Amino acid sequence: MSDRVSQCISCGSTNFKYYTENKTLKVPIYICQNCKLHVTGESQKQLDDILKKLYENNFWDMERNEGLNDSHTDTYSVSRKRLFLSQIKYVKKFLTKNSKILEIGSGHGETLIELDKLNFQTTGIEPDLKNVEHLRKILKKSKIIHSSIENLDIDEKFDFIWMSHVFEHLSDPISFLNNIKKNMHKPYFLFIEVPSVTKKKDYRKFTVVPHAYNYSGIALQNVLKKTGYKIISCDYFGPPTKLNGGMNKISTKIFKKDYYPFYPKMLLDADTGEDIRVIAQYSGMS
């Protein structure tokens, strides 16, 4: 059954072309020729079964976990904290001191810990029990729940959803975007960051990572609009060059502020940006 490539979930097109095989999941990847959405697998049931077995076998962050430490000073954790510094600058005008934040996919906890330090009341959702047990020991104002997003069952309501490099792992993003509405105050904001498929001369190719979908900016916006969300912003980001770093260092030393507004990440265009960031709002009117 080819239900995942019978019609594009983003634009409705039926024009897909085979791209390559996902080497981790052992299923084909197809590309929608209209919106450039990359679709992993042909059968929804087959993909769900494969992903379930993969994560039950602790694949999630398996390789990275070997280099992680509880003080979060390892290379991966430091890079995630740097990413957070850029992301919080991007979203801060949509947050208040009373905002209740729901982070989907907390991982090792870098974002959750930093939000906790800023005194935001944040709840993290994380399927990896090892990560959950570690975070419960160090969080102060915030909390972490051991659950997959598919099995999430909580009575609380939130004002802001934070998803950093998680949305691309969802095999049924339309259902997620609709189902999560019951846990949110209306109106609410949603922040998503995902890898971009539109960067030219991209070394990544997306052939190894267990992503259910990989998005272009248009495809991501279409999926959100389809479920009633209003797009506030959609931008492309990437790492700074040495020149960017030097300019920013001079600015912080002399003027006590960043030269680039979202440093240590750079606001780029679709051809050069590695990642897509979207802020969307759901008002409950649709």
Predicted regions and their residues:
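Conserved N-terminal segment of class I S-adenosyl-L-methionine
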Residues: 1-164, 174-177, 236-237, 249, ...
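A SAM-dependent methyltransferase catalytic signature shared across enzymes that methylate proteins
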Residues: 9-17, 218-235, 253-255
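A short His-aromatic
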Residues: 165-169
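A short glycine-rich, Lys/Arg-flanked "PGG" loop and its adjoining helix->strand segment in the class I
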Residues: 174-189
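Feature marks short, surface-exposed loop/turn motifs that line or immediately flank catalytic pockets
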Residues: 187, 198-200, 238-240
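Short, glycine-/aromatic-enriched active-site segment of Class I SAM-dependent methyltransferases
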Residues: 191-223
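Short, electropositive alpha-helical surface patch
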Residues: 245-256
